[in-house]
Amino acid sequence: MKPPNPTNPNDQNVELNRTSLYWGLLLIFVLAVPFSNYFFN
């Protein structure tokens, strides 16, 4: 992963979006585990 280029602020936005996307997927996964256990029991 290359460091963000200070002359290009768009790079920093891309990094932020990618990080928030990963956190969102992690949150969905953590929430899906107990729900799947509840539905499949």
Swiss-Prot record:
Segments passing through the bilayer: 20-40
Keywords noted in UniProt: Chloroplast, Membrane, Photosynthesis, Photosystem II, Plastid, Reaction center, Thylakoid, Transmembrane, Transmembrane helix
Pfam families: PsbL
Signal peptide as annotated in the record: none
BP terms from Gene Ontology: photosynthesis
Keyword match Chloroplast: yes
UniProt xrefs under InterPro entries: PSII_PsbL, PSII_PsbL_sf
Gene Ontology cellular component annotations, sorted alphabetically: chloroplast thylakoid membrane; photosystem II reaction center
Protein localization: Plastid, Chloroplast thylakoid membrane
Topology term for the membrane: Single-pass membrane protein
Role played: One of the components of the core complex of photosystem II (PSII). PSII is a light-driven water:plastoquinone oxidoreductase that uses light energy to abstract electrons from H(2)O, generating O(2) and a proton gradient subsequently used for ATP formation. It consists of a core antenna complex that captures photons, and an electron transfer chain that converts photonic excitation into a charge separation. This subunit is found at the monomer-monomer interface and is required for correct PSII assembly and/or dimerization.
Oligomer status and interactors: PSII is composed of 1 copy each of membrane proteins PsbA, PsbB, PsbC, PsbD, PsbE, PsbF, PsbH, PsbI, PsbJ, PsbK, PsbL, PsbM, PsbT, PsbX, PsbY, PsbZ, Psb30/Ycf12, at least 3 peripheral proteins of the oxygen-evolving complex and a large number of cofactors. It forms dimeric complexes.
Family membership: Belongs to the PsbL family.
Protein name listed in UniProt: Photosystem II reaction center protein L
